[in-house]
Regions:
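Sec-dependent N-terminal signal peptides
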Residues: 6-13
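Boundary regions of SH3-family modules and the immediately adjacent low-complexity/disordered segments
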Residues: 2-5, 17-36, 50, 60-62, ...
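Primarily extracytoplasmic ectodomains and periplasmic/lumenal surface modules that are beta-strand-rich
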Residues: 67-71, 79-80, 150
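Short beta-strand elements that form the blades of beta-propeller/WD-repeat-like
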Residues: 249-263, 304-316
Length: 354
């Protein structure tokens, strides 16, 4: 018996070593992150295949093989299967998305809205820039900046054989939420107050989207006023609320433009809508035209708590402008030095007259 054990034990060790040496090996090609809300992990690339698992946005995977447009990956739970390589982000792009998010978090919100259609989120303005995510229709987003990019209409988007034409289009830097089924955990998580469907787990995300694919959530009276004035809104804010017998009424500031997309100015028009207590309706309390304003517009408070807003004027006399709402009257607030310069210019012009 002892002799048999002396033979069996070394033989078993040899078998174990050989099995380990000749085990199937997976080459490690790097890591990647899922860029879709959800995608299926398949057993093979054949037409007849089985689903192994479901991956979600932000999941980290190890890439162990490549075949055309598909990659073989290993998940954090150890599952191995195939996914579309176009649905994964390289580590450098993932880190870039984190930097964009951190920068967007520090920016003041310029407007709130929802996606009109399925909308690609990109790292920079431009339809050829790398894609980070795709929002579904009706997803809430917060606008924090505006940009401009060239847009070339390809031939299948035109009804004739005209030469391809390069246009400029507006883009918004937005922050929103990538939603995940309940119970899922991702590589990036944080708090956010954007409304999402009950039960969904969410992680914040930021990037650039085509501006006209976002519908701003303007109050109805403001929307009607902007439409009748033929002004396209690019930013809007609630300045304050006034008490009425039927409840508090918000008073709003809206920035917009009448120009086509792709202009250097973020907005050229400012309008303030206030509530008229006597007539029980909204009215346009303030209009400023012929601006060339730059986002962000920042809200503040005056010495008595009055709403103030400020922005940079980037044409003509490049300066910061400040306005204050007192009850239903909006006036520009000038710094003492600025007021003296204006008085001096007026006096010089008056003395120059014959």
């Amino acid at each position: 018996m002892k002799r048999k054990l002396l033979v069996a034990v070394p033989l078993l060790c040899v078998v174990v070593v050989l099995a380990w040496f000749f085990r199937p090996k997976h080459e490690y090609l790097g890591e990647a992150y899922v860029s879709e809300r959800s995608t299926t992990l398949w057993s093979s690339v054949a037409q007849v295949r089985e689903p192994i698992d479901v991956l979600h946005y932000g999941d980290r995977v190890d890439v162990i093989a490549r075949r055309n447009d598909t990659v073989k990956v290993r998940t954090g739970s150890g599952a191995v299967g195939w996914v579309d390589a176009r649905l994964l982000l390289e580590p450098a792009l993932w880190q870039r998305s984190i930097k964009i998010l951190n920068a967007a978090k520090a920016m003041p919100v310029q407007a709130r809205g929802r996606t009109k259609v399925q909308t690609n989120l990109r790292v920079e303005p431009g339809r050829t820039e790398p894609r980070l995510y795709q929002f579904s229709r009706g997803v809430p987003v917060e606008v924090v900046a505006r940009g401009v990019a060239d847009w070339v209409q390809v031939s299948d988007e035109r009804e004739n054989n005209e030469a391809q034409e390069t246009k400029k289009e507006d883009w918004f830097l937005v922050r929103g939420l990538a939603t995940r089924p309940p119970g899922e955990v991702s590589a990036r998580s944080s708090e956010s107050n954007t409304t999402t469907p009950p039960g969904d787990q969410t992680i914040p995300i930021a990037g650039w989207v085509v501006a006209r694919f976002v519908e701003l959530d303007l109050p109805e009276a403001v929307r009607e006023g902007m439409a009748s004035a033929n002004v396209r809104a690019t930013a809007w804010f609630e300045l304050n609320r006034v008490a009425t017998p039927s409840g508090d009424k918000p008073q709003s500031l809206v920035a917009g433009t009448r120009s086509a997309e792709g202009q250097p100015c973020d907005f050229t028009v400012l309008r303030v809508y206030t509530w008229n207590q006597r007539r029980t309706r909204y009215e346009t309390a303030f209009i400023e035209n012929n601006l060339c304003g730059q986002m962000p517009i920042r809200l503040d408070k005056g010495p008595k708590g009055e709403p103030e807003f400020r922005f940079r004027q980037i044409s003509g006399a490049k300066e910061e402008r400040v306005y204050r709402l007192t009850q239903t009257v909006v006036r520009r607030v000038r710094e003492p030095g600025e007021a003296n310069k204006k008085t001096a210019r007026a006096s010089a012009a008056k003395s120059a007259k014959p």
